[in-house]
Amino acid sequence: MANQLRERHQSLKKKYRELIDGDPSLPPEKRKQANLAQLLRDSQDRNKHLGEEIKELQQRLGEVQGDNKLLRMTIAKQRLGDEEIGVRHFAAHEREDLVQQLERAKEQIESLEHDLQASVDELQDVKEERSSYQDKVERLNQELNHILSGHENRIIDVDALCMENRYLQERLKQLHEEVNLLKSNIAKYKNALERRKNSKGQNKSSSSALTGVLSAKQVQDLLSEDHGCSLPATPQSISDLKSLATALLETIHEKNMVIQHQRQTNKILGNRVAELEKKLRTLEVSGLWSLPGLSYNVSIGFGSMFFLKYLCLWLIAVH
């Protein structure tokens, strides 16, 4: 190899000397011009030849790249065709991307597994806490039944007692409102009696009209045709009519208050019925409730029977 390079160097050196020296028959100036012209032509020819070679090489490179791509596709198709689940042929950079994606997926899977384990542990803690609360409720029911000297087979439910307590509180509030209404009516009747005692020298009908407390019969008598036609347009009659209108307005207001209290009572009773139905459904689902004629072990409170009796009596009175 070294001998070949040495021979190549000697030949190039000799050729370079010949080009520099040129034709010995020409004068030195002409010889230099001829040498330069020859060098220029040779350089142009060489450049042209090299340009053609570059084009040819570029064309061959494109063909080789196309053949390489086609060959890779053919190999991949053959691999996929030979196996049922073939392994795809990936390039180096694609394999790196896939490895990175696989690592990220593994990290996500590990994170999800950790979260799942934490959720399972939390669920187990909640179940244990629920069991402890259930045991506590059972113990409270037994203690409450023992305090109330109840029967062992009829344990009083705490939820039923709480529901009974809410119902009684609402009823107590309703009764307070009714007591206040009755007190206002009593005060009005007292004022009417005082005015009646003080109004002397007037007839019975006019005094009744001025009291502000009228019965249905008194109103019908005052508004009858005989009294209406024979009623003179005097200040006394106008005052009686004003008193009658005031009494009617007060009576209407009282009736409205009674209706409102009745609606509130109906709402309380409706809520009570809904709570009892919910309690019965809960007992039915838990297996503690049975068909009529059979007994169940959990009591819903002694106040419930009183409430049912009261509800039946109220429905009979309404209808």
Curated annotation (Swiss-Prot):
The keyword Acyltransferase does not apply. Residues 1-199, 259-286 form a coiled coil. It is a single-pass membrane protein. It comes from Bos taurus (Bovine). It is found in: Membrane. It holds the Pfam family CC149. This is Coiled-coil domain-containing protein 149. GO terms for cellular component: membrane. Belongs to the CCDC149 family. Keywords: Coiled coil, Membrane, Transmembrane, Transmembrane helix. The chain crosses the membrane at residues 298-318. It comes from the Eukaryota.
